[in-house]
């Protein structure tokens, strides 16, 4: 009887180890798939993104910095990939670990066409990042006047202030927290 229990216990332990190894393998596979997904967005590889979309992959999955495929595609200037991800249901309002959105990244990088598309998304034009900054503040700071006008037309609060007291108007003038910004 004791030998039988020993064999059963050994079998259960072996099954647990195998199951855990399978789970570890599944986690590794999932991590690699996320890496491939983010790399495809970073490169603007629409064929690869299409495979992920058709497979039902979570389009709003985030990496360690909180970046989504949409944030990466916008930041790297891949308008076709941005459009593809939006049409497939990616959420343009998702914020990274610092609270920045795909729109903020596009404005920062000067991707005007992509930013215009994202301004048309159903996100609040006054969505704030972790520093209290809005997309309009980014547009003012980086001298993207046409985007600032588009955000204003969407109802952005141009009188808002960030955590340091900067406003759209002060940023437009190159003033950061009461000091002149380097020009």
Where are these regions (language model features)?
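Conserved ankyrin/ankyrin-like repeat signature
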Residues: 48, 80-81, 113-114, 146-147, ...
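Leucine-rich solenoid repeat scaffolds
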Residues: 140-183
């Amino acid at each position: 009887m004791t030998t039988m229990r020993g064999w059963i216990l050994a079998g259960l332990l072996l099954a647990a180890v195998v199951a855990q190894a399978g789970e570890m393998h599944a986690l590794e596979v999932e991590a690699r798939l996320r890496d491939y997904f983010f790399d495809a967005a970073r490169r603007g590889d629409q064929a690869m993104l299409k495979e992920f979309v058709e497979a039902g992959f979570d389009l709003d999955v985030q990496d360690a910095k909180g970046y989504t495929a949409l944030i990466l595609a916008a930041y790297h200037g891949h308008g076709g990939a941005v459009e593809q991800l939006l049409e497939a249901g990616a959420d343009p309002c998702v914020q990274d670990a610092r609270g920045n959105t795909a729109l903020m990244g596009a404005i920062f990088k000067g991707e005007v066409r992509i930013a215009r598309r994202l301004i048309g998304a159903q996100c609040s034009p006054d969505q704030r990042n972790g520093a209290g900054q809005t997309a309009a503040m980014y547009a003012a700071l980086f001298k993207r006047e046409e985007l600032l006008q588009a955000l204003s037309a969407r109802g952005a609060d141009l009188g808002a202030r960030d955590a340091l007291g900067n406003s759209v108007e002060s940023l437009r003038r190159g003033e950061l927290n009461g000091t002149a910004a380097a020009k």
